[in-house]
């Protein structure tokens, strides 16, 4: 045992010299929890709550934090705010920026948390965790969190068209399946609700035992057709709006010099790429700025996820941590690319991988790899004008 005079000294507190007031916002439908760490206040974080959507109360609390920090230190400090991306969108971030406050929106998934099976989870703990993540980010520590690049209101609104069309088509599928299910219970099959003569054919239908359709069932199917026709009209209206958006895209949307065409027009010029594919690619992905192809693949969730520990070294597949709409569209577009661009370098690579597997083509994994390669190739095509090797353009 060590003597009293030989015992190590007790650890001293780490001195923190803050150059700003660091604030995190925990947003909910009823209240906003403000967690702050101010200069001159030690290591203890203060917490205050304001009613949800009370911007005036939020700004008043920020002003009070500045006043107290100035009273303690005699200096003026800026405010730096962090919040998680969620249901509230980006309007609070834009309000804070308009007030001259530095604001950050963070992806909550990569923030380090306890790996215990049952861990404590409260707004207080989450607020303190966000403040610590913000401190580490401002110190320049790598991979401590993932800050989002907040889209402009125009970029955010541009995505609405393709997303609304997807929601409408999903709803259309539900109505079609419901109509077919109602009729199948009466022994009727082969009825196509999407055909133009759907009303006429409904009047001619007979049950499996030769009876006319029951009165109430026929009325229910008629009301389902009313909803289906409303959806069909709305989908057509959205598609017209989508085509107008693609046609009105500025020439500068292609990011390289001497480009006389906007990015959507360049995409539509390739055989196998239609208006919907081009709209999703442009609005969800290619309209953004990326520094390299790794960022492109990571944004779509198509980046590899390695697992290395000791002698274990294998790949877990793609991360799926990116934009799910873009990733789904790319998988579908990869199959269309094989059909319409069979002699391109990408399609030949896909076929060569099949031969290497002795004909037992692992299509699911290979088509995902092709989708990643296709996205990178289209990004280079739109941003640098690099034409995809062997790609065929549409005939005018």
From Swiss-Prot:
Matching InterPro entries: Transp_IS110-like_N, Transpos_IS110, Transposase_20
Keyword annotations from UniProtKB, A to Z: DNA recombination, DNA-binding, Plasmid, Transposable element, Transposition
MF terms in GO: DNA binding; transposase activity
A biological process from GO: DNA transposition
Source organism superkingdom: Bacteria
UniProt keyword Translocase, yes or no: no
Presence of the UniProt keyword DNA-binding in the record: yes
Family to which this protein belongs: Belongs to the transposase 20 family.
PANTHER family associated with the record: PUTATIVE TRANSPOSASE FOR IS117-RELATED, TRANSPOSASE FOR INSERTION SEQUENCE ELEMENT IS1111A
NCBIfam families the UniProt entry points to: transpos_IS110
Protein name: Putative transposase y4rJ
């Amino acid at each position: 045992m060590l003597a009293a005079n030989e015992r190590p000294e007790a650890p001293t507190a780490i001195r923190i010299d803050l150059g700003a007031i660091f604030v995190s916002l925990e947003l909910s439908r009823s209240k906003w929890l403000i967690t702050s760490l101010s200069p001159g206040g030690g290591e203890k974080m203060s917490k205050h709550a304001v009613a949800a959507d009370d911007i005036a109360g939020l700004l008043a609390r920020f002003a009070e934090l500045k006043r107290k920090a100035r009273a303690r230190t005699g200096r003026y400090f800026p405010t730096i705010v962090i919040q998680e991306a969620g249901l509230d969108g980006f309007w609070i971030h834009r309000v804070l920026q308009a007030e001259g406050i530095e604001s950050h929106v963070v992806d909550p998934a990569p923030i380090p948390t306890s790996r215990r099976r049952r861990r404590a989870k409260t707004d207080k703990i989450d607020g303190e965790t966000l403040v610590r993540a913000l401190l580490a980010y401002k110190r320049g520590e790598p991979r401590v969190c993932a800050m989002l690049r907040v889209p402009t209101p125009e970029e955010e609104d541009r995505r609405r068209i393709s997303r609304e069309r997807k929601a409408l088509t999903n709803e259309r599928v539900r109505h079609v399946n419901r109509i077919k299910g109602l009729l199948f219970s009466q022994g009727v099959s082969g009825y196509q609700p999407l055909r133009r003569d759907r009303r006429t054919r409904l009047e001619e239908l007979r049950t499996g035992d030769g009876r006319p359709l029951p009165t109430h069932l026929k009325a229910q199917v008629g009301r389902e057709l009313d909803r289906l026709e409303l959806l069909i009209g709305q989908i057509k209206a959205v598609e017209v709006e989508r085509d107008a958006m693609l046609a009105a895209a500025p020439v500068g949307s292609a990011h390289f010099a001497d480009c006389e065409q906007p990015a959507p027009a360049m995409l539509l010029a390739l055989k196998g790429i239609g208006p919907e594919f081009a709209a999703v690619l442009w609005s969800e992905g290619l309209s953004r700025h990326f520094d390299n192809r790794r960022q492109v693949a990571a944004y779509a969730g198509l980046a590899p996820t390695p697992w290395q520990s000791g002698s274990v070294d294998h790949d877990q597949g793609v991360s799926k941590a990116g934009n799910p709409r873009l990733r789904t569209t790319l998988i579908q577009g990869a199959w269309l690319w094989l059909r319409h661009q069979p002699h391109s370098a990408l399609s030949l690579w896909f076929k060569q991988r099949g031969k290497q597997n002795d004909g037992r083509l692992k299509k699911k994994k290979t088509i995902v790899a092709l989708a990643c390669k296709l996205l990178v190739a289209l990004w280079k095509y739109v941003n640098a004008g690099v034409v995809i090797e062997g790609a065929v353009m549409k005939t005018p």
